[in-house]
């Protein structure tokens, strides 16, 4: 029951029934998650206070969706054959599947823990789950199974739910990185065409790619004097061939919070968004318009504005010393271990922080999908559904931002013909501030990440910055690149991303941001690691890029290994400001 009205009289639970002493109990009808009081109209998105939007998003995140909302599929729904195979006697009255989505009624069921702590009123060191857990991770029992081939194939992809704290920062940092990469692609393409026109022959040019100072391999293009170009991304590393940095999910398959939210609603609950299926009943449950544009905006904003993780350095001298020692080893700066560490060690990929030049989150308004019949319905059996590049919001944002930057009055250095990544990186830093993420639609919602204003407690605290327009260092502990993790961790097959034709190979995984990692066990993409030390050791297998680092870790003394773990244990998920438990 979503909410129960109780008197001030003492209540006692008896076998699941609430007995109200001294007064008669008043029955309250069960309500759906989406009511007129919380529904958001996208056409009026700029009329609502941000607090209202976020509070409604929290409702959609935590309150179980019901059949009245549109939860579940009909008897002839996309996963009907799978449900019938798994539950032959209960079908069609059993609405869940579990082995390929249809596994829950709310986001909260799989994002519900932010670790343990000692409550302030405890007299011992006994631990209790932290309050304010919305947006956290979950245990192995909440793993998601993605298997469109069930029952003909028993398992395919298994995913442990990650926490979603600070995702707005991640989206914005990745957007700036994508813009920087796309700028280099556009500049070298223009240079190749210009040279081909001068020489009257096809010209091939190459350039090393960098974003936020990090390497992304080499991009090449062959252009004719007529402007016909053939790109070569065979030597590009850490990012897909479209050069879009995707900061979300274990494989790096989603570039915006919204795209993943709309597909997760469909995959896990069969709550279909109009931006995906239009006004068509694609899941055949007799309901249309299950998730409106405004309601998806609210849920997206709620998730993206979760407060960022933080670092809790032990207050005692011994604990602080252990933390600092672990940090030095993690970053490869421990002087007494010169020659024994592998370069910058863990920080080679788990980069301590990335700069965000413009601390602004854009929640895009994609409009209603142009689906006019059942034949146009997208697949519901995939965790993420791709869009063609021309309909993909992030791709279009990057494209327009690059064009605006190159047209800016201060872009002379970028238009000088240099394809040097360092020159481009230096010039683009200030231009990112001058040319913010473009507005693709009047309904796009913009939120300042540093000072969002009046917002629910779960949003705070934010990352520090002197002003609401100043750059922010985002301590993700990630380079937001994909890496080969070897045969030991690789998936059994590819996983598609959010753009048509982009597939992530089985051994490739996104460098998982480690901020908050202490409170997100079990660890790794499928939850196989029961401890942080296990997670480190499981990075090693044939073909893994992490092998040299893991080998160096294995050679450390037990005390130094525990120091690295202590550093990771300081990366915490915070209890929201003004939320307390105990006295």
PLM feature segments, named:
Residues 13-24:
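Bacterial N-terminal signal peptides
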Residues 1-9:
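N-terminal secretory signal peptides that target proteins for export/translocation
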Residues 29-583:
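Periplasmic c-type cytochrome electron-transfer domains
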């Amino acid at each position: 029951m979503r909410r129960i009205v109780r008197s001030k009289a003492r209540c006692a639970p008896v076998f699941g029934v609430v007995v109200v002493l001294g007064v008669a109990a008043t029955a309250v009808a069960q309500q759906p998650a989406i009511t007129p009081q919380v529904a958001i109209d996208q056409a009026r998105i700029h009329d609502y206070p941000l607090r209202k939007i976020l509070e409604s998003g929290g409702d959609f995140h935590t309150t179980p969706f019901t059949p009245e909302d549109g939860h579940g599929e009909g008897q002839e729904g996309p996963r009907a054959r799978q449900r019938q195979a798994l539950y032959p006697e209960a079908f069609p009255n059993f609405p869940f599947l579990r082995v390929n989505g249809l596994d829950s009624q709310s986001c909260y069921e799989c994002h519900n823990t932010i670790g343990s702590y000692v409550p302030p009123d405890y007299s011992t060191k006994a631990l209790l789950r932290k309050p304010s857990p919305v947006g956290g991770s979950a245990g192995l029992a909440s793993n998601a199974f993605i298997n469109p081939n069930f029952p003909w194939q028993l398992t395919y992809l298994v995913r442990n739910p990650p926490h979603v704290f600070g995702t707005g920062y991640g989206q914005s940092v990745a957007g700036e990185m994508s813009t920087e990469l796309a700028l280099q692609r556009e500049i070298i393409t223009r240079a190749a065409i210009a040279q081909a026109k001068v020489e009257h022959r096809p010209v091939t040019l190459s350039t090393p790619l960098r974003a936020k100072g990090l390497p992304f391999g080499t991009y090449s293009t062959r252009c004719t004097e007529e402007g016909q170009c053939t790109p070569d991304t065979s030597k590009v590393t850490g990012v897909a061939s479209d050069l879009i940095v995707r900061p979300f999910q274990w494989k790096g398959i989603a570039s915006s919070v919204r795209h993943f939210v709309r597909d997760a609603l469909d995959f896990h609950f069969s709550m279909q968004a109009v931006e995906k299926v239009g006004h068509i009943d694609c899941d055949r449950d007799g309901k249309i318009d299950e998730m409106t544009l405004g309601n998806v905006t609210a849920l997206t904003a709620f998730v993206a504005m979760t407060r960022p993780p933080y670092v809790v350095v032990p207050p005692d001298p011994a604990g602080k010393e252990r933390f600092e020692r672990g940090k030095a080893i993690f970053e490869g700066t421990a002087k007494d271990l010169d020659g024994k560490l592998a370069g910058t060690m863990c920080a080679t990929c788990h980069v301590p922080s990335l700069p965000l030049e413009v601390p602004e989150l854009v929640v895009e308004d994609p409009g209603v999908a142009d689906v006019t019949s059942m034949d146009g319905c997208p697949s519901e059996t995939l965790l993420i559904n791709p869009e063609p590049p021309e309909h993909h919001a992030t791709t279009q944002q990057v494209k327009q931002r690059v064009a605006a930057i190159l047209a800016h009055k201060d872009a002379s250095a970028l238009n000088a013909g240099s394809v040097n990544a360092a020159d481009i990186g230096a010039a683009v830093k200030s231009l990112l501030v001058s040319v913010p993420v473009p507005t693709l639609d009047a309904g796009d919602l913009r939120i300042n990440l540093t000072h969002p204003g009046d917002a629910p407690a779960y949003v705070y605290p934010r990352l520090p910055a002197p002003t609401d327009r100043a750059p922010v260092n985002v301590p993700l502990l990630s380079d937001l690149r994909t890496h080969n993790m070897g045969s030991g961790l690789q998936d059994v097959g590819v996983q598609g991303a959010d753009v048509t034709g982009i597939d992530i190979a089985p051994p490739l995984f996104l460098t998982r941001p480690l901020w908050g990692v202490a409170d997100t066990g079990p660890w790794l993409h499928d939850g196989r690691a029961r401890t942080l030390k296990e997670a480190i050791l499981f990075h090693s297998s044939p073909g893994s890029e992490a092998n040299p680092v893991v080998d160096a870790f294995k050679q450390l003394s037990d005390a130094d290994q525990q120091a690295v773990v202590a550093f990771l244990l300081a990366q915490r998920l915070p209890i929201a400001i003004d939320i307390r438990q105990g006295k």
